Regions:
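Intrinsic-disorder/low-complexity signature in envelope-associated proteins
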Residues: 1-30
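Short proline/glycine- and basic residue-enriched helix-capping loop/turn segments at helix->loop/beta transitions
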Residues: 26-64, 87-121
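A short acidic/small-residue loop/turn micro-motif
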Residues: 77-84
Length: 121
């Protein structure tokens, strides 16, 4: 798992749910990883409670990029604080469509890991 952005994976199903963790062609965000980071930076709203308590850190999320490129299930792998966790999930659910991952030339559902940083500037 990377610190700056996300990672799809290469040809194994994770957990028997029909969602791949590793595929031949991982899902990609339109415009690439820098565009994904910029989207999150623009749309992430620092929770007031977290600001007041000077809470900073990373929420590690995992979500499914569906065969149509939309975001499916979102799972918090490592939380920070409840308000920050909810905001990270909200932003991920608002992401525009990805270019879906492919296995044997067909679009498939793929898990995608993404750390979201909360830093007070």
């Amino acid at each position: 798992n990377q610190s700056a952005g996300g990672k799809g994976g290469g040809g194994e199903e994770g957990g028997g749910d029909g969602v791949f963790t590793v595929v031949e062609q991982p899902p990609t965000f339109p415009g690439g990883e820098n565009a994904l980071i910029a989207y999150i930076a623009k749309h992430l709203k620092y929770p007031q409670v977290a600001l007041e308590q000077e809470i900073q850190g990373v929420v590690k999320l995992r979500f499914v990029v569906m065969p149509d490129g939309t975001v499916g299930d979102v799972v918090i792998q490592q939380g920070l604080e409840s308000h920050c966790d909810k905001e990270a999930v909200r932003v991920v659910k608002s992401l525009p469509r990805f270019i879906p991952g492919k296995q044997q030339g067909k679009p498939v559902a793929v898990w995608y890991s993404l750390p979201i940083r909360f830093v007070i500037m």
